[in-house]
Structures are given as structure tokens and as C-alpha cells.
Amino acid sequence: MLAQHLPVVVIGAGPVGLSAAVQLLDRGLDVLVLEAADDVGASQRDWGHVRLFSPWRYNVDKAAARHLEASGWVPPPPDDMPTGLELQQRYLLPLANLPLLSGRIRRNRRVTAITRVGVDKTRSAGRGDVPFLVRTHEEDILARAVIDASGTWWTPNPLGAAGISARGEAALAHRIHYGIPDVLGAHRERYAGKTTLVVGAGHSAANSLLPLVELASATPGTKVVWATRSADLTRVFGGGEADGLPARGRLGSALRELVDSGALQLVQHFRIDSLREVAGKLEVAGLRDGAPHVVRGVDAIIAATGQRPDLGMDRELRLGVDPALESVLALAPLIDPNVHSCGSVRPHGAVELAHPEPDFYIIGSKSYGRAPTFLLATGYEQARSVAAMIAGDREAALRVELDLPETGVCSSTRSAPAQDAGGGCCAPAKSACC
């Protein structure tokens, strides 16, 4: 069965998935975008109250912008920093509604498996000539190529220090928020007058801790406990006034001041093992500095512990995945968070993103696996390069067209006036993770 007349299937209608669709359409290829949620940009909507650290100029794909502007779209001020909701409503929704894309996006289509027609993972002969079969709950779709841009937002890391859920975590999931809740807005009542344990040592944790302390100053009985696996908080505190990104420096400095002032209780070097409910309160147990330790009297937990990729849908394909990071294999030495910040990751494209499975690519944050060093501008460059490679334009695929400022861009901070926005997701210098 010849596959060349079939569409390229893009999984995920977030910023990078829609960018890939535009790039493919610009090259004359048929495209079908499958989105598990009820609309595009569902992840951005979920953290809609959080303000990106990077300005609009680095959050809009250039190819997409050309089509939008041709339709009369007025771009937001390039140096303003959007919230997640603004990114969805002012960019992703207008993009998805363009005639170019509107009929090619299928919402509420969760992909459950990807394979080859009539061919399982073990068969090699003629494998690359057989179309892909992309299965959703509603239908099977045949494709000439598949781009997985489904992201990692919906698969957060658990609280357990060993990389698995802590004992009791699943049963108490209704007391845990994974990610960044809207503490001063939609989720205020959940935390007002309560004791909240925030787990994590990155900027997602900072973006929960700062509003929680603000809430505590206005609402009696509100208490904040911050638990970190590491004893070193340098990454989240940052460089202060010496930070190349001033707003990120302000965020870290504000958090450091809160810790120094005693406005929150800090539990460092704490490795969580179990959770249980006692008389309506949570007890969180584990090891602190190698000795048993229990945090008691907790009403709610915020798990700001990062994300990991869900590779379940891809398991019948021949993947090249790093055993530690679960990133695309060739990217691992480039993005290892033990070595690199976002800014030190060199530009890469279709060659690095290729798998042993021909014409299958993972792009966007999922391509980085568990590494927190992904930036949105890099995702757009990935999409451009992969689209060129699928279209047979290897020369264009090998070109580097990524343009970032000297100090880099980063995300994110909770919603605030744009000039006061700050945050970040990875350590030194130019960094971003949106």
C-alpha cells in the first residue's frame, strides 16, 4: 500500500503541533491534527493564570504569523509577556480558526496507539513503505508520516522520591494539585486558612510559594511549608540582581527573602515515601538527611515536581529514546539538565529528532523527555526542520533558523502586570521552558 497520498498526522494542537501543521501545509502536504482536548492550546489554558517569562516575539511562530497577519490579525506588542490564557486566546485560537487549519483539526481525538498497517514492531522487511495506523477511540487513521507533539503537561512526576508514586498518593490525589494552581484566583478557597505543602525546587514551585505567602498575609490561618529533595536551592534563587534576566532574578530574590524571613517553613533534603490521612489532616513521611521525618498537619499539597513523557501510544514503533531522560536519544547529551541550561542547548532539527522508525518524529517538550530545559522557540525550529525533511527538502531541514537574544528567554511567572513578570524554569543564563 502506497502511503504518499495519505496525510501527515500531527498529534497535539498546542503551539508546536500547530506550527508543524502550518509548516507542512506551506510545503503542499496534506495534514490532519489530532487533539485530545476539547480545543487547541489546552495545556496553555490549564496554566492560563501564569505569565510567561518570554515576550510575544519568541512565542509566535514566524510562518504562522505570516498567515495570521494576512487574515488581518494584529500581533500583540512584541515585548509584552503573555499569560498562558493570552497565548491560547490571542494566538492559538485565531491560528486554528484560519481557513488553512480549521478543517484539519479534530478535537476530542485522543490517540491511543500508533503502529504500521498489518505490521508489528518486530517486522523489518518493507517497514518504511507501509502506512502508519493511528488509532483513536473513534477511528483508525492512515498516515504517511506521524509527528508526536503531544507534550508532557498532562503527565506530571509523582511525589515519591524514587520516581514512582508515594504510598497513599493515588488514594489522596483529591488533596494534591499537580502543576501551578491559581492560588489567588480560581483555587483561592482551597488554600485560604489552610496549611499547604509545596513540593519541588524549581520555578513552578516558586510561582506557587509566592502567592501562597501573599494569601497568608491576607488570610489568617494560612500556612506554607516548602519541601525540596535537594539541599541546594541555588537554581531557584538564581543570581538576583546579577541575573541576565532581571525579572527572573527578582523572582528568586523574593523567594530567598521569604525563606530568610521565616514566612514559610522550609524542609530541605526531604525524600517523600508515603502519605496518609490522620483526623482529616495529611501526614507526609520520608527521609530527611537520611533519617525518618514526617510533615504533619497538612491540608493540601502542591506537587511542582515537573513532568515526564507518556510513551504509551508510541510503544509499537521503533523508538530511539534515552534510557535516563526518556528524551529523543540523540538529544540526550545536548539537553541533560545535569550539564545544560536551556541557553546552552544548541539548535537541532530533523536529523537529531529521527527515530529508527522511518518518518516518525517526536517534537516539542516531549522530545526533551524529563529534561526541564525545553524552550518554545526551539520547538518551532524543530517543527520547521521536520516538516522540511518529510517534504524531501533535506537542505532546508539541515539549516539552522533559530534566533534568540543574548540573554535568552524563559518562562514562567504567575500572572502580574507584564513589566513585573518574572520566573524561569531552568538554571543559568538564557533559558525557557514554555
Sequence positions of predicted segments:
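Glycine-rich active-site loop/strand segments that organize a redox cofactor
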Residues: A37-Y91, R167, G179-G185, W226-P246, ...
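Feature captures the FAD/FMN-dependent oxidoreductase FAD-binding
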Residues: V74-T155, D273-V284, G297-A300
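A Rossmann-like FAD-binding core segment of flavoenzymes
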Residues: A113, V213-D322, A388, R394-E406
